């Protein structure tokens, strides 16, 4: 029994995405960018959320084209190159996801959409899609709106979009050191560590630094910040976070201590960028 060529074509970006995942895992262990703290139960939590991410992706992969149909503002599918469709969709998507990311840091939205992702003290490939299922679903919906009714991508173009977007997230969350010049082109692990910095959690929102530079949220960095994530104990409270409880606000440290820590972290960020 032969396999349809379309299935082979669709499988290629998925296989390459899996290969990029494996490559970053290997690089993290062969040449880690810095020593990561130990976090009890981290791998179990990360595996659980990753399985949820995979399930949502598989269930919705072909659903969006049925919902949105063929009507679209643009017709990237007319390029007759799914690879270019995917790259074009990813580039356009970085603009929309920059603003969506900033919105997720606003009070209220943070609870539903983003505190789980910022809770780990370990920033590595596993952290890439460590997100609340609601956030994962909303990301998928936004991607679908960009790809189909806006850009008019084909299904195969959407699979290539997932390859570029997924590999990008794996890259800038990976615990690897990168050449300094890369930070002018794409979000690097060093830049993104600033975004996850303990008691800061801001700036460097975009998959590419262009949007952060344009809209005043770029914070330069050529090295990793000393600490990321939530206070000790808070990051392990996955169930309360899934129930939209603000575990960061429940930090038992006195307000003065939290304020001083935030001030120190921000001063450190300014010094690194000077």
Protein language model features and the residues they cover:
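Transmembrane alpha-helical segments that form the membrane-embedded catalytic/substrate-channel core
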Residues: 19-31, 91-106, 162-178, 188-194
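Membrane interface segments of multi-pass transport proteins and intramembrane proteases
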Residues: 2-7, 37, 41, 62-87, ...
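Core segments of transmembrane alpha-helices
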Residues: 53-60, 133-147
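Cytosolic/stromal cytosol-facing helical appendages immediately following the last transmembrane segment
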Residues: 2-7, 11-15, 110, 119-130, ...
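Membrane-embedded alpha-helical segments that form the functional core of polytopic membrane enzymes
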Residues: 14-17, 76-104, 158-159
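Membrane-helix interface linkers and caps
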Residues: 20-46, 61-78, 223-227
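Juxtamembrane helix-capping/reentrant segments at transmembrane boundaries
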Residues: 34-56, 119-131
